[in-house]
């Protein structure tokens, strides 16, 4: 049976949480993700066998997920899980990938019964998850679930251990900046020299249509490399070439052809910021401070500072691009303006025309650091003819998400639209000529070229009320010029000249302003233009004809593209703000229902989903979701139809009777509380009736009558005697 995405996420995270104990998130994530991987390959193999199609992963008999579920409560569950994983690894060249996690480690999972309960509960988390039978829809479901887990693990892992994950919004931004779309051919190659869990590579490949791109990646951390390889298989990219971990890309690059670095069509990267030991494995001349043993000529434009590897990664990426190659790399903001050796390298790269664009991002977007970062967009094609660098200041574009900042969909879309069109927007974007950059000593600090926008009060009513008078500063009213261009008579209707220099005077009372605006013909025309734009989206017709198997993500992207097109025609409205409203509504309301409809049409409305509890150490049932109905002590959830509608349609009489009884109970409880309060005062009936457990035990102990001790009804009499 299909399950809501949001409920899948909460179940997965609850499973991870139940396992964590004293483990760090960087450790317990491996147990959860390994089991998700085992569930996926098991379901995929079953479905491939059923459809007589090729399966990239062989699952031996006795190693399917139902065999794992059968281990629930087994005293040797940890050891037997290890053996199942070892056999799958042996058959599929996955040694060192999926068998690096020890499911029999009592230092992490507890001893004896504690381990048995923890693992039994964990394997049950994935029991109801069905993967592999619905093609692309399952890929979306699994990919989003994996992304959800990775983001939460990164958030919980702390500063030094969250760098394996690049936020999905940033991954999407980099991929779109490269111009990858459904028309990009599968033989186009993409490379990430610091690939972490592979999220950047997979996001870029997913944009290239059904067959994706040819993927290459290298990661130094061995456990993260294993995570990356699993991630590739989970996302139908089992043939991705991921180098075995353990060696640095800078000192020991894996992808070499004919003695030179292999060149790729696209490169994406989010390398560790300001790496201090980047020279490990390389030799630096103590006098010239130049690398003297790099056979790949990566440092011909200069050697970065010995204690800061930002430009070392950038130079490696440039050398790894084909002559027509394109790249996008995340680096700390300091690479734009730091001087000395880095300034010289930056000048050389700009002179050669390799840097096409620079985008300043908000601070605190990444899990490994809170410092501001930027995107360096590289393009070797037509580099010799490049006359400038396109800059975007998106440092104010984000939303708060716990203790981190996140890019919104509207932020990414605005950056991409602006960059692709090379559109100059006041306080946001600008094409800066190389002559101007040269005049600034090749400093790329965005603030030198794009003036920050002064924040002003957006609410006219709040502005007027804040001054608590009939006078308003002219310089503050200027901020509303775009509105006065649409509502042309509004300014003269609201304000008049005053006897106070630099101020306007109000013509009308403050409390009448809102009615005056909303009742004006200009506002009515504006309101009509908004409704007309909405009508042109044809949403009701679109949503009334949803066929089973439709792709919810594709549909919402199509709708949001229309939103941008239609609301561009509406003056003063921010089309990206409207775009975000649709995205938020989809994420918070529509996507769960759409996925259910896509999987099962309206069959999901005919069924209640049984909730399976986890058992705590006392064998008490623990449910991960709140039930909608309890029938003979069994808990059920209605996924598609709200429970209140079911009650109204099928249990109207019972619901009214229940409501009547609940109201009566509430009245009696209120009367009882009032009675207790009234008679607990010094002169009340209960003043001397001080009964509690200790008093009762004491009185019973002192009682001489056996009947008093045996009969609870006598307790009040004993206590008051």
What are these regions (language model features)?
Residues 1-182, 240-254, 360-363, 391-393, ...:
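Non-catalytic, mostly N-terminal accessory regions of nucleic-acid modification and defense proteins
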Residues 7, 11-14, 18, 27-37, ...:
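Conserved Class I SAM-dependent methyltransferase catalytic core
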Residues 112, 135, 194, 214-221, ...:
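Hydrophobic alpha-helical scaffolding
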Residues 375, 379-416:
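Conserved P-loop NTPase
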């Amino acid at each position: 049976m299909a399950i809501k995405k949001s409920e899948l996420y909460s179940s997965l995270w609850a499973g991870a949480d139940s396992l964590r104990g004293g483990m760090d998130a960087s450790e317990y994530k491996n147990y959860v993700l390994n089991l998700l991987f085992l569930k996926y390959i098991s379901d995929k193999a079953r479905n491939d066998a059923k459809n007589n199609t090729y399966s990239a992963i062989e699952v031996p008999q006795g190693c399917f997920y139902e065999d794992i579920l059968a281990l629930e409560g087994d005293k040797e569950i940890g050891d037997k899980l290890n053996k199942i994983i070892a056999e799958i690894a042996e058959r599929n060249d996955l040694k060192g990938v999926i068998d690096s996690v020890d499911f029999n480690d009592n230092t992490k999972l507890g001893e004896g019964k504690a381990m048995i309960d923890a693992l039994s509960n964990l394997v049950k988390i994935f029991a109801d998850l069905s993967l592999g039978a619905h093609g692309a829809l399952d890929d979306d479901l699994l990919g989003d679930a994996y992304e959800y887990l990775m983001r939460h693990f990164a958030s919980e892992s702390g500063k030094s251990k969250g760098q394996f994950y690049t936020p999905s919004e940033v991954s999407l931004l980099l991929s779109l900046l490269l111009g990858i779309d459904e028309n990009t051919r599968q033989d186009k190659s993409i490379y990430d020299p610091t690939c972490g869990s592979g999220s950047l590579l997979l996001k870029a490949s997913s944009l290239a249509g059904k067959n994706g791109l040819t993927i290459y990646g290298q990661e130094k951390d061995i456990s993260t490399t294993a995570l990356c390889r699993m991630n590739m298989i989970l996302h139908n990219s089992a043939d991705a070439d991921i180098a075995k971990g353990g060696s640095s890309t800078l000192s020991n690059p894996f992808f070499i052809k004919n003695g030179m670095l292999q060149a790729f069509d696209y490169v994406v990267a989010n390398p560790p910021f300001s790496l201090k030991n980047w020279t490990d494995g390389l030799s630096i001349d103590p006098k010239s401070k130049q690398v003297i043993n790099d056979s790949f000529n990566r440092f011909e434009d200069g050697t970065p500072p010995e204690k800061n590897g930002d430009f070392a990664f950038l130079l490696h990426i440039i050398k790894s691009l084909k002559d027509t190659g394109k790249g996008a790399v995340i680096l700390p903001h300091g690479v734009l303006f730091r001087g000395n050796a880095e300034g010289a390298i930056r000048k050389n790269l700009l002179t050669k025309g390799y840097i096409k664009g620079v985008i300043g991002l908000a601070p605190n977007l990444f899990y490994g650091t809170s410092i501001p970062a930027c995107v360096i967009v590289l393009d070797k094609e037509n580099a010799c003819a490049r006359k400038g660098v396109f800059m975007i200041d998106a440092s104010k574009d984000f939303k708060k998400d716990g203790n981190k900042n996140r890019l919104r969909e509207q932020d990414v879309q605005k950056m991409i639209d602006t960059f692709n069109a090379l559109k100059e927007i006041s306080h946001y974007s600008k094409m800066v000529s190389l002559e101007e950059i040269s005049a600034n000593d090749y400093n790329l600090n965005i603030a030198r070229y794009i003036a920050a926008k002064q924040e002003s009060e957006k609410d006219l009513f709040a502005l007027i009320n804040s001054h608590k008078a009939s006078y308003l500063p002219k310089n503050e009213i200027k901020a509303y010029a775009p509105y006065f261009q649409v509502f042309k008579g509004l300014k003269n209707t609201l304000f008049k000249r005053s006897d106070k220099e630099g101020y306007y005077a109000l013509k009308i009372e403050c409390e009448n302003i809102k009615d005056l605006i909303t009742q004006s013909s200009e506002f009515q025309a504006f309101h009509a233009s908004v409704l007309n734009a909405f009508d042109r989206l044809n949403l009701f017709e679109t949503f009334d004809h949803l066929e089973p198997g439709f792709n919810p993500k594709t549909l919402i992207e199509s709708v949001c593209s229309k939103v941008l097109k239609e609301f561009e025609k509406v003056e003063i409205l921010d089309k990206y703000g409207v775009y975000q409203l649709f995205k938020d509504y989809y994420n918070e309301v529509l996507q769960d229902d759409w996925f259910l409809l896509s999987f099962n049409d309206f069959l999901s409305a005919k069924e209640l989903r049984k909730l399976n509890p986890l058992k705590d150490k006392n064998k008490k049932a623990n449910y991960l979701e709140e039930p909608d109905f309890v029938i003979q002590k069994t808990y059920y959830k209605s996924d598609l139809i709200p429970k209140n509608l079911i009650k109204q349609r099928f249990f109207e009489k019972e619901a009214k009777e229940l409501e009547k009884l609940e109201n009566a109970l509430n009245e009696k409880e209120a009367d009882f509380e009032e009675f207790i309060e009234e008679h607990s005062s010094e002169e009340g009936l209960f003043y001397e009736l001080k009964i509690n457990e200790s008093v009762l035990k004491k009185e019973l102990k002192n009682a001489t009558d056996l009947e008093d001790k045996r009969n609870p009804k006598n307790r009040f009499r004993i206590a008051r005697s």
